[in-house]
Amino acid sequence: HIFDFTNVPVVGRVILALVVCIVLCTVFTSIAGFFTAKFKMHPFISTMANMLVIFGLVTYATKGVSFGSIEATIPNMIIPKVNGCPTIILWALAAIVIVWFIWNKTTFGKNLYAVGGNPEAAAVSGISVFAVTLGAFVMAGILYGFGSWLECARMVGSGSAAYGQGWEMDAIAACVVGGISFTGGIGKISGVVVGVFIFTALTYSLTILGIDTNLQFVFSGIIILVAVMLDCLKYVQKK
């Protein structure tokens, strides 16, 4: 079979999976970025539309059937445990450092702030709004691909096309709680990290308290609603 790589060494399959994840995610986010940059579409809309397309394609390709787990040697190769603690946190720290550096120490990062805050003013100052917007989506695609690769390494048991559904809302909630503004141009990496810790702690607390999993979505929705409302109020006051 054309997609049968069982004869390929494990290391080769791991590297191939990483390349495929990053390439596919970058291609799809680039498409969303193009529509956002070219037609001034709201990034939330283009991203959600993209997500539906991807989910449909994956469901069609797998026929909605669950697939088996990966070899036990692969998780130990990518995210081995040290004294019982998973080293996936080291990958997360590496991603934080890299994104922080891009955001704060490069011209592209400074242009991101400018375009997010006021695209018209950024264009007048000579910044290519199209290139910066597309670049932001490409960078997101690379991170998505890398994250999906790590998540596959964590997978225990069978998986399905629906795996990970709803996580995008958790990511949005964590960012909003961390001070990222929906109006653009406001936010720091440190704030996102704090937001992730707060939202994760809240989720685990609800689980420990025995709150029904379905009701946890209600709490997540309320958090997003309140955080965005406060963000909008700050924006209106600034105006």
Model-predicted regions and their roles:
Residues 15-23, 45-48, 89-94, 134-138, ...:
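Hydrophobic alpha-helical transmembrane segments
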Residues 13-20, 27-32, 83-159:
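Helix-loop-helix "hairpin" substructures at the membrane interface of multi-pass membrane proteins
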Residues 22-25, 51-59, 91-102, 137-148, ...:
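Hydrophobic core segments of alpha-helical transmembrane domains in multi-pass membrane transport
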Residues 124-131, 154, 202-239:
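Cytosolic-side transmembrane-helix boundaries in multi-pass membrane proteins
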Residues 3-51, 194-195:
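Alpha-helical transmembrane segments within multi-pass membrane transporters and channels
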Residues 144, 155, 159-218:
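Transmembrane alpha-helical segments in multi-pass inner-membrane proteins
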Residues 8, 15, 39, 43-106, ...:
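Transmembrane helix-bundle core of multi-pass membrane transporters
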Residues 27-39, 60-61, 101, 105, ...:
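Membrane-interface helix caps of multi-pass small-molecule transporters
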